[in-house]
Regions:
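Short glycine-enriched loop/turn motifs at secondary-structure junctions
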Residues: 3-5, 59-64, 94-95
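Mid-chain, well-packed structural core segment of small domains
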Residues: 67-79
Length: 119
């Protein structure tokens, strides 16, 4: 077996409509068609990467689990989020690898901005 890429990430959220708006309006994802699956959710895309939001009643965000978005300019990305009312940590350097900072979506899922050092 040879895997070619990650097709999508599935993310549980408390309110699919609210979180869909966040991922589209704040982070720049696009909505893509989603079949009726019998529960609320949304399929979103950024380029050829997909994010599937699944509404889970009583959802509580997991601790420590996260995924990262690569950015060319972490300060500009952080400023954009902050002007949209998103609380974002200060960027920190991780060894000789990258700059990173963290924020949460409306359901409390932890997300990361990641800029390669030297970029």
């Amino acid at each position: 077996m040879q895997l070619s890429r990650v097709h999508h990430i599935s993310l549980n959220v408390a309110d699919a409509a609210r979180d869909t708006k966040f991922y589209i309006e704040i982070l720049g994802f696009q909505a893509i068609p989603r079949p009726d699956m019998g529960f609320k959710g949304a399929w979103l895309a950024m380029g050829d990467q997909q994010l599937h939001l699944l509404e889970v009643p009583g959802f509580e965000a997991p601790k420590g689990q996260h995924f990262a978005f690569g950015v060319a300019d972490i300060q500009a990305a952080r400023t954009h989020l902050m002007t949209q009312g998103v609380d974002v940590s200060e960027p920190t350097a991780l060894a000789d690898v990258c700059w990173q900072c963290f924020f949460k979506d409306p359901s409390g899922n932890l997300l990361e901005l990641n800029q390669a050092l030297g970029a």
